[in-house]
Swiss-Prot record:
Name recorded for this polypeptide: Probable GTP-binding protein EngB
Domain of life: Bacteria
Family: Belongs to the TRAFAC class TrmE-Era-EngA-EngB-Septin-like GTPase superfamily. EngB GTPase family.
Protein's gene: engB
Organism: Heliobacterium modesticaldum (strain ATCC 51547 / Ice1)
One GO term describing the cellular component: cytosol
């Protein structure tokens, strides 16, 4: 799949603000500063489509990006950053839960984790929450350019073990800097949105 057109549509905090064009959606979840915005920008070949920030917890809304006029990527607020106020965190929880449990257009969830480190308690809690509500979620291990390629398999094994991810669920190694794993992620989105399997086997650990 190729992304030929991408546009930011809306930042939403409640269901009435969500797009009403009934297009399929894939949600991105992950710890603050794990690289969700950088992932979106790399996939869309746009530097500033999704705003990146050096300040964790900057994303406080559900941000909808329309892709090829046919589907959405939805960037959810990052979790697990202590400096964000308790009031803000308390408001994010119900907002994210309502979207993930109730949104009929949601076709899949992608959880992003930092490949450099073992999953955090927040990563594990999110995974357990998704499993509890039977929400299928793939995993992308970000910031792959920060470690030696020879260490990918070891780090992915740790992620799979800590998050209790079955072998049939892919973990894609990705770098927004080099583009490593980009085609794998595009294939995954195509599968979630359209049910289309990749034409060729790719490096998914």
């Amino acid at each position: 799949m190729k992304i030929k057109e991408a546009e930011f549509v809306i930042s939403a905090v409640k269901g009435e603000q969500y797009p009403e064009d009934n297009l399929p959606e894939v949600a991105l979840v992950g710890r603050s500063n794990v690289g969700k915005s950088s992932l979106i920008n790399k996939l869309c070949n746009r530097r500033h489509l999704a705003r990146t920030s050096s300040t964790p917890g900057k994303t406080q809304t559900l941000n909808f990006y329309r892709i090829n006029q046919a589907a959405y990527i939805v960037d959810l607020p990052g979790y697990g950053y202590a400096s964000v106020s308790k009031t803000q965190r308390a408001s994010w929880g119900p907002m994210m839960e309502h979207y993930l449990k109730k949104r009929l257009q949601l076709r899949g969830v992608i959880q992003l984790v930092d490949i450099r480190h073992p999953p955090t308690k927040d990563d594990i809690a999110m995974r357990e929450w998704l499993n509890h509500f039977k929400i299928g979620a793939a995993v992308i291990a970000t910031k792959a350019d920060k470690i030696n390629r020879g260490r990918y398999a070891k780090h992915v094994k740790q992620i799979r073990q800590d998050l209790a991810i079955p072998k049939e669920i892919p973990i894609i190694v990705f770098s927004a800097e080099t583009g490593h794993g980009k085609e794998d992620v595009l294939d995954l989105l195509d599968y979630f949105w359209n049910g289309i399997q990749p034409e060729e086997e790719r490096e998914i650990l």
